[in-house]
Amino acid sequence: MYSVIRSFGLNGLNGFAVAVEADVSGGMPALSIVGRPDSAVRESGDRVHAAARNLGFKWPDRRITVNLAPADVRKTGPVYDLPLLLAVLSSAGQIEPPPEETAFLGELALDGSLRPVSGVLPMALTAAASGVQALYVPAENAAEAAEACGDTMLVYPAHTALEVVDALRGIRPISPIRCAPFDPTDAWNAAPDFADVMGQPLARRAMVLAAAGGHNVLLIGAPGTGKSMLAKRLPGILPPLTREEAVETTKIYSIAGQMPKGRGLVTVRPFRSPHHSASAVSLAGGGAQFRPGECSLANCGVLFLDELPEFSRESLEVLRQPLEDGQITVSRAAGSATYPSHFQLVAAMNPCKCGYYGHPTRPCTCSLSAVRQYRSRVSGPLLDRIDLCVEMDPVAFDELHGTASAESSADLRRQVLFARQVQAKRYAAPGFEGVHCNARLTAGQVRRVCRMTPAAERLLRASYETLGLSARAHDRILRVARTVADLAGKQLLDEDSLLEALQYRAQEKVEL
């Protein structure tokens, strides 16, 4: 007897429909799973057999063939355990076939309980778009799956496979779970406050510009100057996530298996801080089974690279594509996958190997050639993609013990939100599709929105010729100047806007 159960799998960041077909026929007792299953899917036969027996069902003492269609796409993970069990029981005549518009996801324990699986949100979104009206998932995945409900699909949380069978039989119905209200502003309360940072007015200003325009930042300073403190506080002044950004970020974290249990959407902008020993694969993603790397896990948030020159050259060069394109493509023998990587890079480095080159009181033990060698580990093309660079001096005693209070994150956030509102209004016009901050302007769009006063234009020409700027560096200076002008409420870029943008140039501060 033949039966088919609807389920879904993952291909990169998106789900795809899978038909779990089962056929119970005469022959020697055996279970064969075909349709390009990986090892986890092949092992599911043993889990399903034990779960069926422990739930009180009779396992068919015949030949069982299970096909996962389409057969030309590789199937990974234990997500097919529950639909495989239902397909076998239905094919053996022990339960009625579920309605065609019903789908199932979930891993089975040996006692028949359901365990959470990765990637539920993208699969649930595909299910809703495919006309599924009822989706049964493990209870711990239900809040996440409910974010895909819409008006046509209901999500049913289950703790065991027996609950699913009883619900299908009408014995014990399961109440569907509702989508939780979306409120990303609560994330601001959890972020550390800028009021804790003493001194460093130029670096604080750079962080405001970074948040207001979506720019990348490099902080250079001796140990203890506050580089890490500033980086960790940047998410607290960024605008709240939109629902579209939250869905995209949640899909990434769900696929990576990093969603907290029982959570719906990710409402906090990510802050990722990989160690400098991180490999290129851990940053880019990939592996035997495609998984997002740190560049994608920082999507819509902040990627903080402390001790930047200590990263391997291969790891740093991985950053070039996502910084330029906002996405990263991972290619392996089994195929390729593209993940979004719209992150803000905040990098920090010491001025030299010992950390005290140029320090006012502590002597540097590095030779000039050693300092040059240390700084040369950060390539010119990578520096060309960093908009803001700040050299940070040690904090003076009077600044640490002064009575003047520093601006709080709430104060800085108001400035950032004002500038973002200006940009949102500007980029709502035709020709700016996909642009929501100054840092994402293309070269052609920069010409449209970065109009200057005559004096500012003369200053830019002189700077371009004197500093030997590249075309990319020229455009990045204009983007930063546009952000400075937006914070000040100016329509045209004036000399002050350009001068402030020029002082943040990274190339001259890193290269000796």
Per-range role (PLM):
Residues 18-24, 283, 387-390:
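Short beta-strand elements
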Residues 34-45, 60, 67-77, 290, ...:
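Basic, amphipathic alpha-helical bundle interface domains used for macromolecular binding and assembly
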Residues 105, 158, 284, 304-308:
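Hydrophobic residues in beta-strands of the RecA-like P-loop NTPase core, especially within AAA+ ATPase
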Residues 219-260:
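Walker A/P-loop
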Residues 300, 306-307, 318:
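Walker B catalytic acidic pair
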